Design a protein with these regions (language model features):
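Gram-negative bacterial Sec-dependent N-terminal signal peptides
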Residues: 1-20
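Glycine-rich, small/hydroxylated-residue low-complexity segments
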Residues: 21-482
């Protein structure tokens, strides 16, 4: 099997597009050959991809059933799959117009261990239209939509039924430099419902008004990634790689570092409700974020969750606690100072892909020390906050831990409290109903003695804990320490 460099295909497509005012059989044959040149030889000859000339477009047929011909029907079976028809039209600027309209209605079964799972997937209608850059082998821009998306899964462990009313998605890619691109995508789904039933017949219903997702890749080095993907496609069915192929794989992985400059992703769920036997829980908004700055040394990986206006079943908590429920809760943390590039390089330099255990215990330990310089992992609290009508707390700072040296850590965080006296007053007023509030009010008044006031009126506590577990608050030693 051979690999055809991406440049060969892109050059051929660009050259052909200039000449392709006429859609003809020769152009279709050349295009089919170029598409199949990226596939393993057996797939290239299987009819997985076929191209024929249409009136104004080339008609490309992708038949997914061919990929399943060698699958044991005792472990996986599916019915309803049919070929997908796409239309590609060359444009004068060397780009390609792409369109596809289809639907999906499949059902099947797979076996994992001794358990069988039945599944169905259905999409009433889906459409994609966009512009493909043949040099990128990716969309320069695209708009996608779908209606009536549903799935079911039934096994001895549980049954799941989920549905989206509709989906719309857009994406754009632009060249940041001659070697890198920026990709931005947005997806919005409406009318989400999901029902889960476990073996005890306990039922959980989940629903959301909308689910939106935004993804941004900045500075993605696309050419090394293309080479790696094609290498994997060319060798995916091999149990073991030849020595020369292992060398090639390692060089491809090195060439992909740091792969991208930044990845930003956010998912927002609006009007979330979770109905359980104990009542309905919910939130006006649930947001999840992830961000990282590439597979490089001194890398950072961040995660975040925000819940706006969470709700609990009526009567689950005493009335006195109602005002204490947060209106907004946010947790954003980052893992910092990770030497990802050096760690990955060590792995590919020392891993033996021909054994079940690619690294020895000593090599695994050394890899851990490389990924985390000095054996330290730094956790940064970018924002941890909780706000309600009676309190407003937030903190930021860092904690450094040493996974191989349990108990060794140091922390430096700063805690802020707005309207502190209002919080204490609320606890004192409700102490007769909730005795624990009285104890909490007493503790807060004690802690206030260590506080500093910021120019905006908030109370502030800088709290440090060193490796000997000695605690300081705003530079003062905490009393009664050993």
């Amino acid at each position: 099997m051979r690999l055809v460099p991406a440049l060969l295909l892109s050059t051929a497509l660009i050259t052909q597009s200039v000449q392709a005012a006429d859609i003809n059989h020769q152009g279709a044959q050349e295009l089919e050959q170029k598409f199949n040149s990226y596939l393993p030889e057996t797939l290239a000859k299987s009819g997985l991809i076929k191209v024929r000339p249409g009136t104004a477009d080339y008609e490309i047929t992708f038949d997914p059933t061919i990929l399943l011909k060698d699958v044991d029907p005792k472990t996986f079976s599916i019915s309803g799959l049919k070929p997908l028809l796409s239309m590609i039209r060359p444009m004068e600027d060397g780009l390609w117009h792409f369109s596809q309209s289809a639907d999906l209605d499949v059902k099947g079964q797979f076996t994992a261990g001794t358990e069988k799972t039945d599944f169905t997937y259905k999409i009433d209608a889906m459409r994609t239209e966009g512009v493909v850059d043949p040099d990128l082998l990716y969309f320069k821009s695209a708009d996608m939509s779908a209606n009536g998306l549903s799935m079911t899964s039934t096994s001895p462990q549980q049954s799941v039924e989920a549905r989206f009313g509709s989906m719309k998605s857009t994406m754009n890619s632009t060249r940041a430099t001659p070697e890198t691109i920026d990709i931005r995508g947005n997806t919005a789904l409406n009318g989400f419902t999901e029902t889960i039933i476990d073996p005890s017949k306990m039922k959980v219903d989940i629903s959301a008004g909308t689910v939106t997702a935004d993804v941004a890749f900045n500075g993605l080095a696309y050419r090394p990634l293309q080479d790696l993907v094609f290498f994997i496609l060319d060798n995916v069915k091999k149990d073991k790689l030849l020595a020369t192929e292992q060398v090639r794989l390692k060089s491809l992985v090195r060439a992909n570092l740091p792969m991208f400059e930044n990845l930003l992703e956010s998912i927002e769920v609006a009007n979330l409700k979770v109905a359980t036997p104990t009542g309905t829980y919910g939130a006006e908004t649930l947001r999840y974020t992830i961000d990282t700055n590439g597979l490089k040394d001194d890398a950072k990986v961040g995660f975040g969750v925000t819940i706006d206006k969470p709700s609990l079943p009526q009567g689950l908590v005493p009335d006195a606690f109602a005002s204490a429920l947060p209106e907004t809760v946010t947790t954003r943390i980052s893992l910092e100072k990770l030497n990802l590039a050096s760690g990955i390089t060590y792995l590919i330099d020392h891993a033996n892909f021909d054994t079940d255990k690619p690294l020895t215990d000593e090599q695994s330990a050394e890899a851990g020390r490389i990924f985390m310089p000095g054996g330290a992992m730094t956790i940064r609290y970018d924002e941890v906050s909780a706000r309600s009508a009676v309190y407003d707390f937030s903190l930021s700072g860092t904690t450094t831990v040493y996974p191989e040296d349990q108990g060794r850590q140091n922390t430096d965080i700063t805690l802020y409290a707005k309207d502190f006296d209002k919080t204490v007053s609320y606890l004192q007023k409700n102490a007769t109903t909730v005795p624990e509030f009285g104890q909490a009010a007493f503790m807060l008044l004690m802690v206030k003695g260590f506080a500093k006031q910021t120019p905006d009126g908030r109370q502030m506590w800088n709290i440090t804990v060193d490796e000997s577990k000695k605690v300081k608050i705003n530079g003062q030693d905490l009393p009664f320490q050993p």
